[in-house]
Amino acid sequence: MRIIVDADACPGKDIIEKAGKENNIPIIMYCDINHIINSDYSEIKYMDCGFQSVDMAIVNAVKEGDIVVSQDFGVAAMCLGKKAYPISPKGYIYSDKNIDRLLFERHLGAKVRRGGGKTSNHKKRNKEDDERLYGNLIYLIKNCDTVLESEELKIKNEE
């Protein structure tokens, strides 16, 4: 098991590293060359600035059982297909039970914006997001064998 992070604009990198260090889980952070990330624990991999280059590097690198931190629903969907455990930087766990809805909502939002409409802005990150991210990372680390089929997952995403 590894923790792979889509680190370009990922809040909570310190929380991810804390969970990884405490459980002796290696962390690999992927970002493009326009971002500088310093870490004494994580391995940092820099990609070209090309369209989706970081996303594709993550999907190509991920293995079954890895935890992937990304706010990109497309990356999450592809990682689910590889039997990995995607989680958002706000701590929401993606699963086969919620990814289709999330992708559909993303599609609808893009369609509205292309038509000149506006969609709602995301809420600012808060302390609860940090706590959810840490708690659900630990939950995934400890329960990765059964988590994606679990009814408990619904509760973890609502906390």
Language-model segments: which ranges?
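Nuclease catalytic cores that cleave nucleic-acid phosphodiester bonds
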Residues: 2-159
